[in-house]
Amino acid sequence: MLFPVLLLLKLVIGALIIDASALSWHDLKWPRDLRPLAHHDLLYMGQISEEDRGDFNATLRNFLVPRVVGSQKHREVREFIVRSLKDLDWDVEEDCFDGQTPHGIKPFCNVIATLNPSACHRLVLACHYDSLLHKEGTFIGATDSAVPCAQLLYLARSLNGKLQNQKTRGDGLTLQLVFFDGEEAFERWSSHDSLYGSRHLAQKWHEDRTSAERLESCLERSEIANQIDRMEVMVLLDLLGAENPRFYSYFGETQPVYRRLVNIESRLNDAGLMELPRRRRRTNYFSNSSTVGFIEDDHIPFLKRSVPIVHIIPSPFPDVWHTLDDNEQNLHHPTISNLNKIFKAFVSEYLQL
């Protein structure tokens, strides 16, 4: 993601943040019924056992290594993602290609895992798995984006039974996980030196033609001409793992979806299920406010092709962003655990698990 944009956000955020309740955005109709989770289901999603914590931490350790494009560790991380999702009986595709970079031709591979490839519509959760080539030393990128990668795999594992049941319903909706390669610039962020994987995949899916007649249970009035059109919404996770992040709704079109995250966090707080320090009574990660989405990230190539976007990235960025301090020691595990609860409930609610 682009650093000058962060500076711009800090300068104008006071002028641009708008109370969502003052807008008509929350009255927009989403094409799907976003019914709140039943209370007992919310309580279930808000419980994380010690076994779950151990599973998540074990998963995370596989990502807490330098993951520079073209390196051995980068390849091992990709293989771990593929193996983990194949073990859960997901359909896994590797979108591999060679790309021109300031450091010459480099190999890239996006990983796309789809629970039910026949389903017409897709709830897409995404992150990037590569790490920055840092000039000053070994960069781990714990928030950027080891934690988001581990969270996606954790969601697939922890919800596996419910997801497999949903897969057999034939309701035309499925979960898709996308792990982008080559998000980071090799030298200086530009339209050519960044977002290698997402630019390639967006173009590929735009050119991959299909139709509603060939797919399972498309919604009425759905206009499906290519794979891009099957993306009902992309939820992009980035820079997660620092204490007390602050998120905003960056796109009016997806305000109804973003508000589900606000609501879920509030309900989990009401139920006493969030992990809090003694001095705090509630978390307040998901602001009930909107701001203009200036940040450049892997969603941009899809946004340009009219894919609805929810961008879960903190503003401001974590203090450790693009420094060698973005490592395991500076992660805040209670915050990560709280976000895992929110994401589990969100996926369960959206897919009506």
From Swiss-Prot:
Q: Which domain of life is it from?
A: Eukaryota
What tissues contain this protein? Detected in salivary gland and midgut.
Q: Name one GO molecular function term.
A: glutaminyl-peptide cyclotransferase activity
Name the enzyme's class: transferase
Deletion phenotype, per the entry, is: RNAi-mediated knockdown results in reduced enzymatic activity in midgut and salivary gland tissue extracts. Weight gain after feeding is reduced. Females lay very small eggs which fail to hatch into larvae.
Keyword annotations for this protein, in alphabetical order, are: Acyltransferase, Disulfide bond, Glycoprotein, Metal-binding, Secreted, Signal, Transferase, Zinc
- Active site as annotated: E183 (proton acceptor), D238 (proton acceptor)
Please classify the protein's predominant subcellular localization into one broad category: secreted
Q: Which residues are glycosylated?
A: N57, N288
Where does the chain bind Zn(2+)? D144, E184, H322
Q: Provide the effect of D144A.
A: Significantly impairs catalytic activity
Catalytic reaction(s) noted: N-terminal L-glutaminyl-[peptide] = N-terminal 5-oxo-L-prolyl-[peptide] + NH4(+)
User: How activity is regulated?
Assistant: Strongly inhibited by PBD150, 1-benzylimidazole and N-omega-acetylhistamine, in a Zn(2+)-independent manner.
Keyword check for Acyltransferase, yes or no.
yes
Q: Induction: what does the entry report?
A: Strongly up-regulated in salivary gland during blood-feeding on the host. Peak expression is detected 48 hours after feeding begins.
- What are the recorded Gene Ontology BP terms? peptidyl-pyroglutamic acid biosynthetic process, using glutaminyl-peptide cyclotransferase
Q: Which first-to-last residue range defines the signal peptide?
A: 1-22
One Pfam annotation reads Peptidase_M28
- EC numbers: 2.3.2.5
Job of this protein: Responsible for the biosynthesis of pyroglutamyl peptides. Seems to have a preference for substrates with neutral or hydrophobic amino-acid residues at the second and third positions.
Name assigned to this protein: Glutaminyl-peptide cyclotransferase
Gene name?
A: Qptc
